[in-house]
Regions:
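N-terminal secretory signal peptides that target proteins for export/translocation
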Residues: 1-17
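Short stretches within intrinsically disordered, low-complexity N-terminal or propeptide regions
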Residues: 7, 28-30
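Residue-identity detector for glycine
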Residues: 12, 21-22, 38
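Polar low-complexity intrinsically disordered regions enriched in Ser/Thr and small residues
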Residues: 15, 24-25
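Generic low-complexity segments that are intrinsically disordered, proline-rich and/or Lys/Arg-biased
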Residues: 18, 36-43
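Cleavable N-terminal signal peptides
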Residues: 25-26, 36
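Hydrophobic alpha-helical membrane segments
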Residues: 40-255
């Protein structure tokens, strides 16, 4: 084969890989550009019922929306992520997926120990929202703790996909191509931190936020408190197409 044919073939392969990266960006942008519902009560969904009464379809759909939001933020604000989109997609993705060799992953401490628990809690709240029998408020009942345990398990599954799946940091940005950027910290801290943060947010919402709301009818104050003290639930609400400060049965105007 002559050099011109070889060169043309190489350029064609690179263009295909770049097209794949471009498609991923387009999907992410389209997802984020969908307007959030203006009402505080979400539209009814179609339930795929299990013995526990969980809307599996809704859980997957809203988790995909959360995934697209997170990847859109990465693409928008991380130059290193955008730079890796132009490489050989499948080859780099395959080389990026491997078992971690160390605990750390070169991320700042606040990313691993604050950011990852929040993103895990958001995934966990999506599960809770679609598990119809899950208590909405913290309590000492076994039903409450079992529901939060299942939410943490879903957060672990979501985190695994976020790290290694077809729509992951490994495929979008090639995190892990450098072995130093792949650590056990994400796989442990995300689900464990999600469980702790969900319980903490539930406690803060019931015993502090709700108490303050009982002493003021200012909607701005009420919304602000919910956003500040419940970051995981805020992100979950946004991904589910609800107002960030949404609470079931507790609109901002409650008395």
């Amino acid at each position: 084969m002559d050099r011109s044919a070889t060169s043309s073939s190489s350029r064609g392969e690179v263009n295909v890989q770049r097209s794949i990266g471009g498609c991923l960006i387009a999907v992410a942008v389209m997802t984020v550009s969908v307007p959030v519902h203006g009402q505080e009560t979400p539209a009814p969904s179609v339930f795929v019922e299990t013995e526990e009464g969980t809307d599996i379809k809704g859980t997957f759909v809203d988790s995909l929306k959360l995934l697209m939001i997170e990847h859109s933020v990465r693409i928008a604000f991380q130059e290193k992520t955008r730079r890796e989109l132009t490489g050989p997609f499948f080859n780099d993705y395959q080389r990026s997926v491997h078992i971690p060799r160390q605990w750390g992953d070169t991320d700042a401490w606040w990313v691993n120990y604050i950011g990852h628990p929040i993103h895990g809690a958001a995934a966990g709240y999506i599960w809770i929202d679609h598990e119809r029998a899950a208590p909405s408020e913290i309590s000492l009942s076994g039903r409450y703790w079992a529901s939060r345990g299942r939410a943490a398990a879903w957060a672990a599954a979501y985190s695994l996909q976020f790290e290694y799946g077809l729509l992951s940091e490994a495929s979008i940005g090639n995190v892990g191509l450098n072995p130093a950027t792949n650590g056990w910290v994400d796989h442990v801290v995300t689900p464990a931190g999600a469980f702790g943060l969900i319980v903490a947010e539930d406690a803060l919402d019931r015993f502090f936020v709700k108490w303050v709301e009982g002493h003021t009818r200012n909607r701005v104050w009420r919304a602000s408190l919910r956003l500040i003290f419940n970051p995981g639930r805020t992100l979950s609400n946004t991904a589910s197409g609800r107002l960030p400060w949404h609470r079931d049965g507790r609109p901002l105007s409650w008395k």
